[in-house]
């Protein structure tokens, strides 16, 4: 009996150890000297240790015969304490060494630059994001197969992989009473990524239920689980959190349990500069990568099978361009020989965010977050008829304008994308905007235009990869509907903040406050928004997965066209935006592509 008690005590104490003690082993295992891998050969090299990179590395190395090297510019950060682990500290990490903070070009909409927040460390942006766990509309994912020809990329398959990644925690009675709704059939329970209600232990604010009451008066559904393929309505939602409320980031979940595998190595503090290509045959082949920290200190490491780019939608396309894979018009002026001519870096689609914030009465105090995924008609309200007229008459003009600005390469192909978006809006009633409510001391709405029609680009500006000189231009609001949509959604947030049951807790507006008349019309909002918004940090599309003739860079197995042994496996490849937070889809992508890689590996044995 005494032995049993002692054993139980030891187990309990071990479980209670702070994460920074439990993670000492992983930090000691990380390689920091590039000479440890320089000149070596492994089966697979992964450029980038973020969400998709670490998920794929963990999946591939389940086979002890497969060796994987992950190269990451940052370090292990999951044990940094509340600034990383506490989702309620969202934003505090911005501007630190864990934030790449990529700067855009000077934006035409306001003659200012903006910062793109992106995680620099093992786990990537799962270290710094808000942790929201929702899924897009079924029609959006289905279109990847039906419109873009990506066989196997449909809702049923992608949702199955997303559930495979998930370890869901159902809300308790208190959380359900506060506004959570849970459909067990829409969640996985045996996966790796912990997802469940955010709960500080404080009472929940009644403002969430007040919002639900206010939108129900408008015919908007409220008992919604945003994981089921139709995110329209108002509800609370899961976050990527353990039950003890510690962030469930990609390094904690995919690397920490697996770092002791002898076939998995992780090199930190190094940048992948370019892919090494062999051109002995008719088709170039990726045989490794060059990596380093600056031009005078680079190394090569070699891949027996494949190189997998997972550096994110801002950086993976630049690695391709530095490698000679991209548009001749971009590469040749920099003195880079074009090995494969592809529209790399185009089709960049990021969302925008503006804020409406109000003071609340003491009766409204408490924790709580909820989202209103609003349809096109709900977003535009009385302006809906005119907005639909734009959709029905302007698509071809918008495509021509986007191509002329360098955001895409072909008007006909872009028109197919626009018609797809119109189909979502008109025939499937997908969510067009998101009003994200946080009740932490205020009633604050972050408001997103979810489906931008504008197209931007990212391109290198120098042939030296280690200078990190590239132009990132999302071209925010250069499409008239995008500006109108962001303006209308933000106007809607102001309206709902002081409507119906919400009025009970309204104690005056602080943002926009006096910066915009309370009775401002939509035209006034379109003048206000360009100077009072931020990027949403959800850029996709820069190495789009679609047919070459439509502007694709990779095929439906994420293989780069015209190159053997090279894939892009990150947020660069979705060909469209989504009415969702993107993590659920990115985890599904990583697992689905991993299976494709493993199938190819098995066929070679």
Swiss-Prot record:
Glycosylation sites: 65, 111, 183, 190, 280, 377, 410, 495
Signal peptide boundaries: 1-16
Name of the protein described by the UniProt record: Glucose oxidase
Temperature dependence, free-text field: Optimum temperature is 37 degrees Celsius.
Gene encoding the protein: gox
Outcome when changing residue 531 to E: Increases significantly the enzyme's thermal stability by introducing a new salt bridge near the interphase of the dimeric protein structure
Mutagenesis / variant outcome for changing residue 164 to R: Does not affect stability but causes a twofold increase of the enzyme's specific activity
Outcome of substituting residue 388 to Q: Stabilizes the enzyme structure by the introduction of new hydrogen bonding
UniProt modification remark: The N-linked sugar chains of the glucose oxidase contributed to the high solubility of the enzyme in water.
First-level EC class: oxidoreductase
PROSITE patterns (alphabetical): GMC_OXRED_1, GMC_OXRED_2
Function: Glucose oxidase catalyzes the oxidation of beta-D-glucose to D-glucono-delta-lactone and hydrogen peroxide in the presence of molecular oxygen. D-glucono-delta-lactone is sequentially hydrolyzed by lactonase to D-gluconic acid, and the resulting hydrogen peroxide is hydrolyzed by catalase to oxygen and water.
């Amino acid at each position: 009996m005494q032995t049993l008690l002692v054993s139980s005590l030891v187990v309990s104490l071990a479980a209670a150890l702070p994460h920074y003690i439990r993670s000492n082993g992983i930090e000691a295992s990380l390689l920091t000297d590039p000479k440890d891998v320089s000149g070596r050969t492994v089966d697979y090299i992964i450029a980038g240790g973020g969400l998709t990179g670490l998920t794929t590395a963990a999946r591939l190395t389940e086979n002890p015969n497969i060796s994987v090297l992950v190269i990451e510019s940052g370090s292990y950060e999951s044990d940094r304490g509340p600034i990383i682990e506490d989702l309620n500290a969202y934003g505090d990490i911005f501007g630190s060494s864990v934030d790449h903070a990529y700067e855009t070009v000077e934006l035409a909409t306001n003659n200012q630059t903006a910062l793109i927040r992106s995680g620099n460390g093992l786990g990537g942006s799962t270290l710094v994001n808000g942790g929201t766990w929702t899924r897009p509309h079924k029609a959006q994912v289905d279109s990847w197969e039906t419109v873009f020809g990506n066989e196997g990329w449909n809702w049923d398959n992608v949702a199955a992989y997303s559930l495979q990644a998930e370890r869901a925690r159902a809300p308790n009675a208190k959380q359900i009473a506060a506004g959570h709704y849970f459909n067990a059939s829409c969640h996985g329970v045996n996966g790796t990524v912990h997802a469940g209600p955010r709960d500080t232990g404080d009472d929940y604010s009644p403002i969430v239920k007040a919002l639900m009451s206010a939108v129900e008066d408008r015919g908007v559904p409220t008992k919604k689980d945003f994981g089921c393929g139709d995110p329209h309505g108002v509800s609370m939602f899961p976050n990527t959190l353990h039950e003890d409320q510690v962030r469930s980031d990609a390094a904690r979940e995919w690397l920490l349990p697996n770092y002791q595998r002898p076939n998995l190595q992780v090199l930190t503090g190094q940048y992948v500069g370019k892919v090494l290509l062999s051109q002995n045959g008719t088709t170039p082949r990726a045989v490794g990568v060059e990596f380093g920290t600056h031009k005078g200190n680079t190394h090569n490491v070699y891949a027996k099978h494949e190189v997998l780019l997972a550096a994110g939608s801002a950086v993976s396309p630049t690695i391709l361009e530095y490698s000679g894979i991209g548009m001749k018009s971009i590469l040749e002026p920099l003195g880079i020989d074009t090995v494969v001519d592809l529209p790399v870096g185009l089709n960049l689609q990021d969302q925008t965010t503006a804020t409406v914030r109000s003071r609340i009465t003491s009766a409204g105090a408490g924790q709580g977050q909820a989202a209103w995924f609003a349809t096109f008609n709900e977003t535009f309200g009385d302006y809906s008829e005119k907005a639909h007229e734009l959709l029905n008459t302007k698509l071809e003009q918008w495509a021509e304008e986007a191509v002329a600005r360098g955001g895409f390469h072909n008007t006909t192909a872009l028109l197919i994308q626009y018609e797809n978006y119109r189909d979502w809006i008109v025939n499937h009633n997908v969510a067009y905007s998101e009003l994200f409510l946080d009740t932490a001391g205020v009633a604050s709405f972050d408001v997103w235009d979810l489906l931008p029609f504008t197209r931007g680009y990212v391109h290198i500006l120098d042939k030296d990869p280690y200078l990190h000189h590239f132009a990132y231009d999302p071209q925010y609001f250069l499409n008239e509907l995008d500006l109108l949509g962001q303006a209308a959604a933000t106007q809607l947030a102001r309206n709902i903040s002081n409507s119906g049951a919400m009025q009970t807790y309204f104690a005056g507006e602080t943002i926009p406050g006096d910066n915009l008349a309370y009775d401002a019309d939509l035209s006034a909002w379109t003048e206000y928004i360009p100077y009072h918004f931020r990027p949403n940090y959800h850029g996709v599309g820069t190495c789009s997965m679609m047919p070459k003739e439509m502007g694709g860079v990779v095929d439906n197995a994420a293989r780069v066209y015209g190159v053997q042994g090279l894939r892009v496996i990150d947020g660069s490849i979705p060909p469209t935006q989504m009415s969702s937070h993107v993590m659920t889809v990115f985890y599904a992508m990583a697992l689905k592509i991993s299976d494709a890689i493993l199938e190819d590996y098995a066929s070679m044995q």
